[in-house]
Amino acid sequence: MSGYQGGHHDQYDQGYGQAGHGDGYYQDDQYYDQGHGDHAAQGDHAAQGDHGAQGTQGDGYYDESGYYHADANNPYHQDGGYYDGHDQYQDDYYNNNQGYYDGEYNQGYAQGGRHPSEEESETFSDFTMRSDMARAAEMDYYGRGDEQYNGYGEGGRGYRPPSSQLSYGGNRSSGASTPNYGMEYGNGLASQRSKEPYPAWTSDAQIPLSKEEIEDIFLDLTSKFGFQRDSMRNMYDHLMTLLDSRASRMTPNQALLSLHADYIGGDNANYRKWYFAAHLDLDDAVGFANASTKNRKRKAKKGKKKGGEAGNEAETLQELEGDDSLEAAEYRWKTRMNRMSQYDRVRQIALYLLCWGEANQVRFMPECLCFIFKCADDYLNSPACQALVEPVEEFTFLNNVITPLYQYCRDQGYEILNGVYVRRERDHKHIIGYDDCNQLFWYPEGIERIVLEDKSKLVDLPPAERYLKLKEVNWKKCFFKTYKESRSWFHLLLNFNRIWVIHLTMFWFYTSHNAPSLITYQYEQQKDNQPPASKQFSIVGFGGAIASLIQIFATLAEWVYVPRRWAGAQHLTKRLLFLIVILVLNVAPGVKVFMFHGNKDGKDADQKNKDTPIDKAIGIVHFVIAVFTFLFFSVMPLGGLLGSYLTKKSRRYVASQTFTASYPRLTGNDMAMSFGLWLTVFGAKFGESYVYLTLSFRDPIRYLSIMKIDCLGDAMFGSTAATQQILCKHQPTIVLILMTFTDLIFFFLDTYLFYVILNTVFSIARSFYIGSSIWTPWRNIFSRLPKRIYSKVLATTDMEIKYKPKVLISQVWNAIVISMYREHLLAIDHVQKLLYHQVPSEQEGKRTLRAPTFFVSQEDHSFKTEFFPSHSEAERRISFFAQSLSTPIPEPVPVDNMPTFTVMIPHYSEKILLSLREIIREDEPYSRVTLLEYLKQLHPHEWECFVKDTKILADETAQMNGEPEKSEKDTAKSKIDDLPFYCIGFKSSAPEYTLRTRIWASLRSQTLYRTVSGFMNYSRAIKLLYRVENPEVVQMFGGNSEKLERELERMARRKFKLVVSMQRYSKFKKEEMENAEFLLRAYPDLQIAYLDEEPPLAEGEEPRLYSALIDGHSELMENGMRRPKFRVQLSGNPVLGDGKSDNQNHAIIFYRGEYIQLIDANQDNYLEECLKIRSVLAEFEEMKPDNHSPYTPGVKNDVHTPVAILGAREYIFSENIGILGDVAAGKEQTFGTLFARTMAQVGGKLHYGHPDFLNGIFMTTRGGVSKAQKGLHLNEDIFAGMNALVRGGRIKHCEYYQCGKGRDLGFGSILNFTTKIGTGMGEQWLSREYYYLGTQLPLDRFLSFYYAHAGFHVNNMFIMLSVQSFMLTLMSIGALRHETIRCDYNPQKPITDPLYPTKCSNTDELMGWVYRCIISIFFVFFISFVPLIVQELTERGVWRAALRFIKQFCSLSPFFEVFVCQIYANSVQSDLAFGGARYIGTGRGFATARIPFGVLYSRFAGQSIYFGARLLMMLLFATSTAWQPALTYFWIVLLGLIISPFLYNPHQFAWTDFFIDYRDFLRWLSRGNSRAHASSWIMFCRLSRTRITGYKRKVMGDASAKMSADVPRAAVANIFLTEILTPLLLAATTTVAYLFVNAQTGVTDNDKNSSSSPGFKIGPSGALIRLAVVAFAPIGINAGVLAAMFGMACCMGPVLNMCCKKFGPVLAGIAHGAAAVFMIIFFEVMYVLEGFNFARALAGIIAAMCIQRFIFKLIVSLALTREFKTDQSNIAFWNGKWYSMGWHSVSQPAREFLCKITELSMFSADFILGHWILFMMAPLILIPQIDKIHSMMLFWLLPSRQIRPPIYSMKQSKLRRRRVIRFAILYFVLFIIFLALVVAPGVIGKKFLGDTIFKALDNGNGGPANLHLLQPWGLDNNNTEGKTETGTKAGGADASATDASKLRLF
């Protein structure tokens, strides 16, 4: 250290006057020439102080070869120098001894006279800071006032940031903010360029500390704390890059000050916020023990002067003594920060960075890190630390402070089993995760919990002594859960309580108002008598009680989820009492009105329906209270009820406010738009819902409430008629309940519908407003493009030498065109037409530039193919570039002043570069095409360009090798010779040719090479811009292009870094390693961060892991690896979560600069987009330095909320690959662009990963760029967005910049992605972030947040719930319609007209309701297309939009939409119930392979196929009982749920493949019973069971044990809800409908004679017994068969197995086959017992199926113990070898017997259902050429360009043909049998078998044992009385038809 021991900084304050450092404080002769100030003594040349032994040339940082001197005094001597010879940090260009840097580096300054003031010059810009502003009141705003230099401002000259760019003019002062280094062109000093690694931080730039001094600080801290050497070097470089980046656009003093403000002391610094939140100001003042933390006020006690003058600081501080308010604390803080020297500021930042750089997982806990830093800082300033002489051992900090915390976090999720870490079977609510640990440090009560091993508290020690005691802390005693992420649906109630309040209450208001017939005493239809007004008001008023109940339940849920012991938990008792009072207020008036009504003792109905004035008044008051309750609870966040975080008075909850509720406020237009959006959404919704849903529901309510059913009931319900008829009499009520529930769901769906529509409208309006739409300035997008390039892409204001704009534009435009040519997007003739050309000018000897006609001619026709192929990638890119420049874009700053940024790409095992084998060989066994063939079909034009290019290259090579020119004759031959080029892209197998083909294919697939090459365009863009904007640089190097290129590279390297985090790099296989090496050679500046592993030092310890960094300049070592530049040891394996976030976290320490762009390994970028980078970074609003010090005490700074994340657009480059790619692309397009546009405006956008830019300091000081708890943070990036939002960061969206992004293209991989998103959303609902946002955001922001994220998934669940509840309702309505006599109903007549025939049931009105429901569901699904069509319209025009829509429809995408909706809904539901959310690696390849039927079936059966099949049977019943044409749409929806996976399977309907696949399916069903088979039905069955049972933990080391990750057993409450209650409700509803169909409604004694059975006795039927027989008999029979098989297996198995290997499978086959046969038999039995009535039989089958499902769910949920991971018990059951299972052979047989009972029935179901699905495809496979049509639909390839069928050998072909014939015969035979079983009984049963069966089963007394097994048939069910008049028949009643009955949509 340079003399700073003991903290004496006088030398520092005197201008760094240490001996040996001759540089004065400021040495910039440009500002201080001889005429000004006393500093002229430094003469024309700045003093070349002698820096110790470090040489006298330059600053002595690097010697001539660019290396740091490794001398004996250097503490790094043993390491071989700062950047030792091998691992040189600067690039190799500095080491090539070509005389580039050999000349003496002389810091000569311009020898000219004084320079004109910058403020007078024309280039005075916002970046120029006026010096008189800087020295207001003789106080330096950038640190302390330097008394010595107070007079330096007289010249009135502003300060321009220095820069790396030298100015090469003599006497000049304008320029791109550059000091003058004064080399005239003729000086011959061109080679003496700055060797500075950090050019803006050099001694010429008035820097407060030189980089050597900063390095000394790092060395000193490292020796005092024991940080790692490599980590220190890494963090030193990190800090210097930050200072260099900031100092390139502001003064170095400002740069350092702003950096310190961002990290430590400013208003937005997380450390400062934490310091006050955790009351550490009090701890520092009086100690926690003496501070009463309970009732601190925020405000100062005495009214303070708002801002003391600087001089009064001491006085003000004295006044504030003893005042512990927040204001006083903040004043003291600012004073302390203001007095701090720049040296101390650097030291604090350095200490923070060193702690952060080694913090590993602790980086996920930002406040824990703040605490560690605070302890370290207190220790650093203590005398004990300053007195240290011996350096502390390396790794001390890591081992003592970080590792114990790391181990605690790891042990929460993992335990050691047999020496290996195994995941614990714990769910989130039992894991103390990163957030729980972090929240310990939010409150003083938490910090007080930190105890040492000796049980003393850490806070009892003085602050300076705490750091050394951290190693003794017993962390296990400190941490506890601060929020329980239990799997429960109540999270939705708590987090989104306002959604439920708004919808349920409004629904109640609407529906209760429209149900007068339910509350009228003795309602009569022909009178239409109304209830008293009091009751009408009061019934509506009960809505307030619903709102209050929701709030009460939400509060109780909060009680459960937020442990009371956490200091941040709100006090809920007061709130609960308040809510109970509100509930009583909302119920009491209604109780009076309904139970103690004034006229309740009236004589007749009319009297009782009259009102008293008091009742009426009470009713109105009740209604008014309800409305106010509703409004209050809708608007008020739950967290804001009665004293909470949201009250600003007390300091009690500052932490929760700071870290969970610091939302950036919306202002101005944004706020207006937010309110406007939600007012229009809910205005439209409430209007439409009232008219369409509720008003039209009025008539069904009326008719169902008066419907009377005469039925005989069921004999099983008792002996009296009343009990027997109990269910069937109430069928109308049951239907009404079901209809109301369905209506309620539609009420929710409506809102989302309007949100989508209006969001789209607002978004489009905004796109017109900013000009990003194709329609806005359409006429001049291209003609103005050159001008826009000049004004928006180039920073020309500061240019030294003024050129004509055309010269500059032409360079940029030509570069873009040539880059497209190089990527083979344009052919050479296109390029010629697009380039600017030099042509001879009219003036003699001069040349001029001719612009391409493209810019003009584009206006005549929208696109001409003469410039580029239509619909090509080139056209898309150029038109987006042109369009984007027509939008408002921030002005770019010169390259020199732009901030440094890093692109970060996490990589796990994604393809780096495709191998030749992958490209030209059919890899998939089921694929029909090579990848190259497929790519050639997709990009024909680009392939042609590539081939031409390759041929030119080959010809050139041939000529160079001296081959003769070709003659005429050869030309014909060469065409044949060229075939290989067109076929595979090369003729010679030399690596340079094959590599070209590999690269071409890789650049069109989803590979890391594509991503890296795309994002390396930033480097090209920076070089291009620097060259174009600084022509003097080009002139200076004259013709030496090599040196010029180096200079440009230096600039690019300084401003941009690309880090790929290759987690597995050190474990790569040979091929992967070669590919990575190829990347490094192609892009030497690419940096790769990876995990390096070393064996443990001692036996039994853990291996040591390191974060290492290499780049293309790193030296290759003997083992083939490269020598890392930095290698930082970690506490252990950093991958504790799902992987991606841990991967990002370990590499984050290697990011450089101010911003990070996070990129996935399947993205792409383009040169023209990279040119806009300066404007994109300007969106962070940090380009212009703030001229006020953040540390002036008493001055309130305007705290502007920092921009944390900037989202960008994505273009999905897989959109032209076929229907699925297009649908996926469309989804992303609308979500990522259309909705992001409005959501960012109204503050509802979060962070979705991909091309988003992050504010580095903001995010890294708040927990990093993603969260990482396993499972919980599955969608890791969105949590970073929520974290940024709740902590006060803004999230913006950038409209004019877009990256490419790949999306998965196969059906399976798209649905994997869907499942991942769905389960991830389930996890988000459990998370604390959702709780904070849901209970604290203001209403408009809350709605934006909800509908943009959770609402989408809730809506999907509601859609599927609505489909299911609608089908159940429809089944009940069908039953009602089937059994009752319809009325002659005319909706146009008055409702008081009598309905005929008398006693009829008006079910026609119900059919109107059914029609409206179908229309609603149609719109709900259709709406998903609207945003995409509108987006296409605005961005690409009418024709393209229409084309895309037609293509999607013809490709049957509506089927796919329905299916995806179900997958979303299912994955969210199953995650909330069972957990198991995990990262699913989604496929990156092309889906051209056919997937076997069995695989598809097993993948989607549980998620969708079973669900669809159940509903389809209900729909079949509805079709046969309540048909109307609109039901056709439902057939489409439900078929979509079943057949989508097969419909989107490539070549599914190819004749041969179909039958080969059928054979596979039969094998899949039967295998796995003799030895374990991963792809078998039994494995699928067991796997679907395990999510309920869980696995046994004991590992038996069997191969079949690896079938799945550990699945924890689901919670009992969740199992009850999803596995027991839901199936029970389903079984009950279907059973009720079945019983009603059999209840003999309207049967009278007159029917005796009409019965087809003589001797028939009228009476209740035995439908329940019939149902029980059909439901339970198959189970009983299966159990019997199994018992017999089990006996045989045990007795004969062990013996027979020796000779008959197939004994087990044969037994299994017999049992399974018998089960399937019995199931079919009992279907027929039901048919017979129902008298061959199809509808009744079907109702019975549906009910029996639901009952069986319920029984099996009960067995699996309650009776089964955990599953073995191996398949042993299943195999043992069939072959009898139980002895191999040890002790388990006692318990397992019984368990396995229960399993087998369920399995047999499930097998039968799968066998029958699988066959029916295959039979559905029969009509399709018979269509000729179906495969071609199907492929056109899937891949959008014309028949001429389609993929050829695979080629088989003769032997294979014969074998396939034989198999096809065999299995085709089997298929069609089974098809005929199945059809016969369904159709025959209905056709011939009644005719031939009727009487025989009747006599056999029913001898006139109800059959055997009087069971009434047979349903009577032939009865006419008609007890109506024609036109007999009934009731009052109020003649001439003037009641008109209600509005509702007139409602028809079409």
From Swiss-Prot:
Q: Give the pH dependence.
A: Optimum pH is 7.
Q: Looking at the record, which segments are called Disordered?
A: 1-127, 152-198, 297-316, 1920-1946
Query: For bias kind Polar residues, which ranges apply?
Result: 165-180
The reaction(s) catalysed by this protein are: [(1->3)-beta-D-glucosyl](n) + UDP-alpha-D-glucose = [(1->3)-beta-D-glucosyl](n+1) + UDP + H(+)
Q: Which EC number(s) does the record attach to this protein?
A: 2.4.1.34
What InterPro entries does the record tag this protein with?
Answer: FKS1-like_dom1, FKS1-like_dom2, Glyco_trans_48_dom
Read off the SMART domains from this record: FKS1_dom1 (SM01205)
Comp. bias (Low complexity): 24-34, 43-60, 91-109, 1925-1940
Explain the regulation of its activity: Activated by iron ions. Inhibited by manganese, copper and zinc ions.
The entry annotates sugar attachment on 171, 290, 1017, 1312, 1649, 1918
List where this protein forms a coiled coil.
Answer: none
Q: How does activity depend on temperature?
A: Optimum temperature is 37 degrees Celsius.
Give the transmembrane region(s): 489-509, 537-557, 576-596, 618-638, 675-695, 734-754, 1356-1376, 1413-1433, 1500-1520, 1523-1543, 1615-1635, 1667-1687, 1703-1723, 1738-1758, 1803-1823, 1864-1884
Q: Name one GO biological process term.
A: cell wall organization
According to its UniProt entry, the function of this protein is described as:
Catalytic subunit of the 1,3-beta-glucan synthase (GS). Synthesizes 1,3-beta-glucan, a major structural component of the fungal cell wall. Involved in cell wall synthesis, maintenance and remodeling.
Family designation? Belongs to the glycosyltransferase 48 family.
Q: How does it assemble?
A: Component of the 1,3-beta-glucan synthase (GS) complex composed of a catalytic subunit GLS1 and a regulatory subunit RHO1.
This protein's name: 1,3-beta-glucan synthase component
Gene that codes for this?
GLS1
